[in-house]
């Protein structure tokens, strides 16, 4: 499995759907999404599926 990356940061609307779905608490959302614990990412893609804006990608 890969790791999460941010591909369209300007499209982030800070809804929090991604961080609320992540089982590893890798993401934090304030004004926009940030990857706070990248080494903890298990590459499950839950955050990618939850994001309505397509901001995230697992590579």
Swiss-Prot record:
InterPro entries on file: 4Fe4S_Fe-S-bd, 4Fe4S_Fe_S_CS, Fe-S_Ferredoxin
Superkingdom of source: Eukaryota
Residues binding [4Fe-4S] cluster 1: 12, 15, 18, 22
One Pfam assignment: Fer4_10
Annotated residues for binding of [4Fe-4S] cluster 2: 41, 44, 47, 51
Cofactor note: Binds 2 [4Fe-4S] clusters.
Record's function text: Ferredoxins are iron-sulfur proteins that transfer electrons in a wide variety of metabolic reactions.
PANTHER family, A to Z: ADENYLYLSULFATE REDUCTASE, BETA SUBUNIT (PTHR43687), L-ASPARTATE SEMIALDEHYDE SULFURTRANSFERASE IRON-SULFUR SUBUNIT (PTHR43687:SF6)
Protein name, UniProt field: Ferredoxin
């Amino acid at each position: 499995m890969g790791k999460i990356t941010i591909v369209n940061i300007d499209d982030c609307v800070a809804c929090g759907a991604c961080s609320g779905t992540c089982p590893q608490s890798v993401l934090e959302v304030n004004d926009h999404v940030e990857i706070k614990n990248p080494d903890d990412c298990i590459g499950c893609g839950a955050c990618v599926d939850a994001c309505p804006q397509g901001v995230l990608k697992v590579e």
